[in-house]
């Protein structure tokens, strides 16, 4: 194994070997030649004039009214920088055109010549084809004062009775009919105007059937007027109680 390496080294230096073409860079050179090998001295890594490029390019002379340029940038195209909000300004649609439908002009804009021209099968010219929004016209009084017209639901409601005038007293409560005779158990005020005595007498007369003692007490305490129907009813109730309870 050792004599093979010695034989390979003893053939000669790399400069005596045949010239090979590098397929990576397209340049012709010898193996191991650092001057014009794979990575050194190729056209991709070095310019045509390395010495002139190392010194730097000559500055561009400035004239009156001209702007300085960087490198080989032309003066006709100045550099522009846009912010984040100005990046897509030119690509946005115009306001109001996004929702426009075909054949319907925008509200408040005159119709285009294509819409104004009559079309085949249309009854009239183009401006008559625009859609109009119907709104109920307000009444004269509401239009003068700038008020909204009343809705139909509000107009169908029954009107309320007019309030009484401030000087008019409240109407009296209705009285019972005069042809109905007052009974002993009636709790309303009597028509004759006797007051609460009639109510007390009626209540006492209704309790006379409970016992003779209560009936006598009621007859003594009530003392109705002579000749009144209440006195006759009290006397009859006292007679019945005395006959049942001797």
Swiss-Prot record:
Bias-annotated ranges (Pro residues): 158-180
* Record's compositionally biased regions (Basic residues): 1-10, 79-97
Give the span(s) annotated as Disordered: 1-184
Q: What protein does this entry describe?
A: Putative uncharacterized protein NEXN-AS1
Please name the gene that encodes this protein: NEXN-AS1
């Amino acid at each position: 194994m050792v004599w093979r390496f010695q034989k390979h080294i003893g053939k000669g230096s790399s400069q005596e070997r045949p010239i090979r073409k590098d397929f990576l860079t397209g340049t012709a050179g010898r193996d191991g030649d650092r001057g014009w090998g794979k990575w050194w001295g190729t056209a991709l890594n070095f310019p045509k004039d390395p010495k002139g490029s190392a010194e730097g390019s000559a500055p561009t002379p400035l004239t009156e009214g001209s702007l300085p340029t960087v490198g080989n940038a032309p003066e006709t195209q100045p550099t522009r920088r846009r912010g984040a909000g100005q990046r897509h300004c030119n690509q946005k649609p115009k306001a109001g055109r996004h929702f426009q439908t075909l054949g319907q002009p925008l509200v408040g804009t005159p119709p285009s010549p294509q819409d104004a021209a009559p079309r085949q099968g249309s009854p009239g010219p183009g401006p008559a084809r625009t859609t109009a929004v119907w709104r109920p016209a307000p009444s004269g009084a509401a239009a003068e004062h700038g008020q909204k017209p009343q809705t139909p639901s509000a107009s169908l409601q029954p009107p309320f009775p007019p309030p009484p005038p401030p000087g008019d007293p409240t109407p009296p409560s209705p009285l019972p009919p005069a042809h109905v005779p007052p009974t002993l158990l009636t709790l309303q005020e009597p028509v004759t105007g006797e007051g609460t005595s009639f109510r007390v007498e009626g209540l006492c007369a209704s309790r006379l059937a409970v016992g003779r003692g209560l009936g006598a007490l009621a007859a003594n305490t009530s003392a109705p007027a002579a000749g009144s129907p209440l006195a006759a009813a009290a006397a009859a109730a006292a007679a019945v109680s005395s006959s049942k309870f001797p």
